[in-house]
């Protein structure tokens, strides 16, 4: 079972990270980013932020590069907003679950079309 404190810190980090990306990041590569979740380790030392990006593969790579470049600033801002002894080390990862869900939905839709045509 996940540590309750880690879950609460992850949820708070998700809210603050979304706000930071919308209001404070000025990098033009970091646009149309949605934070879908944040996993924090039990010792609160590391956090993985799962993001989705609206756009093609090239825009996704550029966004990830922009986030990696701004990682220090983002961590500093999180430290100011969330009262923790040590701000977790951030890493960013693409959330593939939305694309996976869309693919399954389109396959099911195609199956339903084929069944209704027969």
UniProtKB/Swiss-Prot annotation:
GO cellular component: cytosol
One term of GO molecular function: ribosomal small subunit binding
Pfam families per record: RBFA
GO process terms (BP): maturation of SSU-rRNA
The keyword Cytoplasm appears for this protein: yes
Subcellular location: Cytoplasm
InterPro entries: KH_dom-like_a/b, RbfA, RbfA_dom_sf, Ribosome-bd_factorA_CS
Keywords: Cytoplasm, Ribosome biogenesis
Chief place where the protein resides: cytoplasm
Keyword Oxidoreductase: no
SUBUNIT field: Monomer. Binds 30S ribosomal subunits, but not 50S ribosomal subunits or 70S ribosomes.
HAMAP family linked to this entry: RbfA
Biological role stated in the UniProt entry: One of several proteins that assist in the late maturation steps of the functional core of the 30S ribosomal subunit. Associates with free 30S ribosomal subunits (but not with 30S subunits that are part of 70S ribosomes or polysomes). Required for efficient processing of 16S rRNA. May interact with the 5'-terminal helix region of 16S rRNA.
Family named by the database record: Belongs to the RbfA family.
Family annotation (NCBIfam families): rbfA
Name under which the protein is recorded: Ribosome-binding factor A
Species in which this protein is naturally found: Shouchella clausii (strain KSM-K16)
Phylogenetic lineage: Bacteria, Bacillati, Bacillota, Bacilli, Bacillales
Gene name tied to this protein: rbfA
């Amino acid at each position: 079972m996940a540590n309750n404190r880690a879950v609460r810190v992850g949820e708070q980090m998700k809210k603050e990270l979304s706000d930071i990306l919308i209001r404070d990041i000025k990098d033009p590569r970091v646009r149309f980013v949605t934070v879908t979740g944040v996993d924090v380790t039990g010792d609160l030392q590391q956090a993985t932020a799962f993001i989705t990006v609206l756009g093609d593969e090239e825009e996704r790579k550029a966004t990830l590069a922009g986030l990696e470049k701004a990682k220090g600033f983002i961590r500093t801002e999180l430290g100011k907003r969330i009262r923790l002894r040590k701000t977790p080390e951030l890493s960013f990862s693409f959330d593939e679950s939305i694309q996976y869900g869309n693919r399954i939905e389109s396959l099911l839709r195609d199956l339903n079309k084929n069944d209704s045509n027969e």
